[in-house]
A protein has these predicted regions:
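Detector for outer-membrane/organellar transmembrane beta-barrel domains
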Residues: 191-315
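Outer-membrane beta-barrel architecture
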Residues: 59-61, 101-104, 155-157, 199-201, ...
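Outer-membrane beta-barrel "beta-signal"
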Residues: 154, 319-321, 346-358
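Residues that define the transmembrane beta-barrel architecture of outer-membrane proteins
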Residues: 29, 49-56, 95-98, 148-152, ...
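Repeated loop/turn-to-beta-strand initiation elements of outer-membrane beta-barrel proteins
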Residues: 66-72, 108-112, 162-170, 206-212, ...
Length: 358
């Protein structure tokens, strides 16, 4: 396996659509199509996890050259579950739009886009979102304020700080309310009030990156009525450090949140401390072992005081046949106490999979 392919594989594991196929490129318009077919099976004593987990994911990225300095762009991504019946009550479970946004990019001023996109905190969280299966990030989840994927987001990004400082990247994001008082009502634990946040990162010349992000959002009346958690705002800050050179990838993040981390349907933790560490190496023969450690401790819970709400080691091994095909196994060693009072699953999990991506 040559050095160029090693770099491609490491990048593909971290960036959605890194292997996209170009389907149209004419008259200053370009359209790339990407996706993957994931054949996957989980083994666990937890019946909510054990079994088939096969899915298909498809998306496109398009751009149009408006002028010498201005480009328009858009992206859409959808997930199709392939482990359900045809036409039964479960047929549509898990089928969902993951991303959908459009924007403009200026050569110097940066890009601005609006729609369903990743939250500003994911600028940090992405560097440890690397386990092949069990990437249950401690402080990142979809439709959870400004952390994971979510809707109604206006995002501005500028790389290399207006062309003045190589490697210095800044971003700002605003999110409008999504709740029962808007045109897209949802459950309390999927809702959010108006919020905003910022991120800053610096890629050094020595393959080391330093990252930081902060966000704050209004909480809804329904959220404050839940059993756990209380407060007008949900706040979070996160920092990260990454080393990425050829076959070696090392990353760690630390984050602290207030009134933001959900605990099932019970509500939110008043405060959490979150640590994530990953280490990965890609051998020239195509094997890529990875070890990860993830821990989230909730503080001052109304029912139980301080308690781990996520705590596990992750051990995975991937074999890349080429840049498009891989087979893998992932083991989640759960360290959550079996007798915890919040009903958090404590079972270990094993995942096996075969993925074709383009």
């Amino acid at each position: 396996m040559n050095k160029k392919l090693v770099i491609v594989l490491m990048t593909a594991g971290l960036a959605q659509g890194a292997l996209a196929a170009e389907v149209y490129n004419k008259d200053a318009n370009k359209l790339d199509f990407y996706g993957k077919a994931v054949a996957r099976h989980y083994i666990s004593d937890n019946t909510a996890v054990d079994g088939d987990a096969t899915y298909i994911r498809l998306g496109f990225k398009g751009q149009t050259q408006i002028s010498d300095v201005l480009t328009g762009f858009g992206q859409w991504e959808y997930n199709f579950q392939a482990n359900h019946s045809e036409g039964g009550n479960d047929a549509q479970n898990g089928n969902k739009t993951r991303l959908g946004f459009a924007g403009l990019k200026h050569a110097t001023l940066g890009s601005i886009d609006y729609g369903r996109n990743y939250g500003i905190i994911y600028d940090v969280g992405a560097i440890t979102d690397t386990p092949v299966i069990f990437d249950d990030e401690t402080y990142i989840s979809a439709d959870n304020f400004m952390t994971g994927r979510g809707g109604g987001r206006l995002t501005w990004r500028n790389n290399d700080f207006f062309g003045l400082v190589d490697g210095l990247n800044v971003a700002a994001q605003y999110q409008g309310a999504n709740s029962n008082s808007t045109n897209n009502p949802r459950s309390a634990t999927r809702s959010n009030g108006d919020g905003y946040g910022f991120s800053l990162s610096y890629d050094t010349p020595w393959d080391v990156s330093i990252l930081g992000a902060w966000a704050t959002s209004k909480r809804t009346t329904a959220q404050n009525a839940l059993l756990l958690g209380d407060g007008d705002r949900a706040d979070i800050w996160a920092t990260g450090l990454k080393y990425d050179h050829d076959s070696v990838y090392l990353a760690a993040t630390w984050a602290q949140s207030q009134n933001m981390t959900p605990i099932g349907s019970l509500g939110y933790a008043n405060k959490t401390d979150n640590l994530e560490v990953v280490a990965k190496y890609l051998f020239q023969n195509g094997f890529a072992p990875e070890v990860g450690y993830f821990k989230s401790k909730a503080k001052d819970l109304e029912l139980t005081g301080d308690q781990d709400i996520m705590h596990y080691w992750d051990f995975s091994l991937v074999y890349y046949f080429n840049k498009n095909m891989s087979v893998y196994a992932d083991y989640k060693l759960n360290r959550i106490d079996k007798d915890n009072n919040l009903g958090i699953a404590s079972d270990d999990q094993t995942g096996l999979g075969l993925t074709y991506q383009f």
